[in-house]
Each structure stands twice: as C-alpha cells, then as structure tokens.
Amino acid sequence: MGHKIHPTGLRLGITQEHRSRWYASSKTYPSLLQEDDRIRKFIHKKYGSAGISDVLIARKADQLEVELKTARPGVLVGRQGSGIEDLRAGIQKTVGDKSRQVRINVVEVERVDGDAFLLAEYIAQQLEKRVAFRRTIRMAVQRAQRAGVLGLKIQVSGRLNGAEIARTEWTREGRVPLHTLRADIDYATKVGKTTYGVLGIKVWVFKGEVLNEQSQTMPVGANPRRRASRRPQQFEDRSNEG
C-alpha cells in the first residue's frame, strides 16, 4: 500500500504536517476549505515565477495567517515590502473580505534542488521547452544529488518526445522507502503542457529518517558547518500588530 497511497497523507502527524491548520464547525468547514483552495490557486497563478513550493494556512479567530515557502523570497517581498502589501490585498480580494486581517510570512527554501515541488516544476519547464525527457530527468537527478538527498524517484507519463502512444517512464536513484512511516518523503506532482498534450510528472524525494522529535538523520553530502554559515531568509509580517 505504501506505493499506492499518497506519501504525504500516509505520514500526517508522523513526519508531515497539515497544510491547513484550523478548526471549524460542520457548517463553516466547506466554505473555509474552498477559501483555502482559492487562496492557493491565486498565489500559484500570480506568483508562479517566485518558485513557491508550499503554502501553509492557519486561522486564529478573525485573523488569517499565510506562510509561503519560496526559492526566491525577493520576488514576493519586493522593494521595501511593497510585494507583501500587494499580496495581502490580493488575498483579501480573493476571500471577498477586505477587512480581514491577513498576516503573511515568507520563508526561503533552504535547499532548492532538494525540494520535490521545485524539482517537478523544473522538469515541467524543461519539457515544455521541448527538451528530451531522458536528458531532463538526468539533469534533475544530478541537481538533487548535488543537494544531498538520500534518494529520488521521478515518473513522467504521457506522449513522451511526441510519441503516438502514451507511456510511463520512471527512474530511481538511491533509497526511496515508501513503506517506512518514519521516512521523510517529500512528494509533489506537476502537469507539463506541451504541443503534443499534457505530461504528468511525479517526484519523490527521500530526505532521511525521523528517529524522534529531536533528531533527524542528515542527508549524505550535507555539510553542517556550511549550512550553519548561511541561514535561510525569513520575512515575518508584523504590520497588522498594534
């Protein structure tokens, strides 16, 4: 079953956390869930060039907190935080309540080439440029290995290289233990739109095993001194605080 079920859903509460963190009654739950979906679609559509890998949404009373994990935080923040104000206004317009308090936190992705969504996005961009899929997959694997991941699996489905008959091709490097619940598996899907039709892209990234809440195995090739020398950027929005 580990190969069939969604890797993130299987590990919720173990190595993965919920993308939406809030509670609601049975009457308001559907509308809030649809609201989260609209917010995510708006952010990915308008800020697709910022390399946003994840959008975490939390709700506290009448306040909405949105955390963005991105490869290029400068694109979102803008000059003197002007991008944050535009993003807040866009979210308020999307939810249909301009008086809603929206707090935005922008967190830089520490290892871009070790993120499953950003790797899938890179593969989709290359395939849309009509680069051969085997070359694209090989380049993605090399980038992930340089980032120090323990294992990687990539699957591409569709009319590969414009073939008449659609097929599925996949490759795996290193370990990807999908049956191990304590394994930190980063999973993402992406659709590449080509002149021959759409291509489905799936990426599994194995980052290590979480032994307990305090310690986690470091990926092979990771240098702790080098990682400590440059901390990932984090921009916390405090404009709504009195």
From Swiss-Prot:
Cited Pfam families: KH_2, Ribosomal_S3_C
Entry GO MF terms: mRNA binding; rRNA binding; structural constituent of ribosome
Extent of Basic and acidic residues compositional bias: 233-242
Matches recorded under InterPro entries: KH_dom (IPR004087), KH_dom-like_a/b (IPR015946), KH_dom_type_2 (IPR004044), KH_sf_prok-type (IPR009019), Ribosomal_S3_C_sf (IPR036419), Ribosomal_uS3_bac-typ (IPR005704), Ribosomal_uS3_C (IPR001351), Ribosomal_uS3_CS (IPR018280)
Keywords associated with the record: Ribonucleoprotein, Ribosomal protein, RNA-binding, rRNA-binding
Every KH type-2 domain range: 39-110
Gene Ontology CC entries for this record: cytosolic small ribosomal subunit
Biological processes annotated in GO: translation
Region (Disordered): 216-242
Entry's family note: Belongs to the universal ribosomal protein uS3 family.
Subunit annotation: Part of the 30S ribosomal subunit. Forms a tight complex with proteins S10 and S14.
UniProt cross-references to HAMAP family, sorted A to Z: Ribosomal_uS3_B
Described function: Binds the lower part of the 30S subunit head. Binds mRNA in the 70S ribosome, positioning it for translation.
Name this protein carries in UniProt: Small ribosomal subunit protein uS3
Gene this protein is translated from: rpsC
